[in-house]
Amino acid sequence: MANSPQAKKRARQNDKARAHNASLRSMVRTYLKKVVAAIEAGDAEAAKKAYVAAVPVIDRMADKGIIHKNKAARHKSRLNAQIKGLAA
């Protein structure tokens, strides 16, 4: 339990940041799910559109430290490979 005023404020700030970061992580997962759903449906055009929409969001969250940059790169690489597999 935070006792000093400084520790109490930090605890409040941490709670606020945790809630905000959770919503941002959820947004990234939603964009990823849209791409995966289009891939599973076999719709290459929709998958490509969803991927193009997801990439800036993934990159932005990696820049902010919401997700690790390597995780962002891994997601983008795997999704792009799956989309290219649909077209072939």
UniProtKB/Swiss-Prot annotation:
Q: What's a BP term from Gene Ontology annotated to this protein? A: translation
Q: Which GO terms describe its cellular component?
A: cytosol; small ribosomal subunit
Keywords attached to this Swiss-Prot or TrEMBL record, sorted alphabetically, are:
Ribonucleoprotein, Ribosomal protein, RNA-binding, rRNA-binding
Q: Which InterPro entries match?
A: Ribosomal_bS20, Ribosomal_bS20_sf
**Sample GO molecular function, one term:** structural constituent of ribosome
* Gene3D superfamilies, alphabetized: Ribosomal protein S20
Respond yes or no to whether keyword Ribonucleoprotein is given for this record.
Answer: yes
Q: In the UniProt record, does the keyword NADP occur? A: no
Q: Where is this region: Disordered?
A: 1-23
Name the protein family: Belongs to the bacterial ribosomal protein bS20 family.
In terms of HAMAP family, this protein maps to: Ribosomal_bS20
Q: What does this protein do?
A: Binds directly to 16S ribosomal RNA.
What's the name of the protein? Small ribosomal subunit protein bS20
> What organism is listed for this UniProt entry?
Teredinibacter turnerae (strain ATCC 39867 / T7901)
Q: What is the lineage of its organism?
A: Bacteria, Pseudomonadati, Pseudomonadota, Gammaproteobacteria, Cellvibrionales
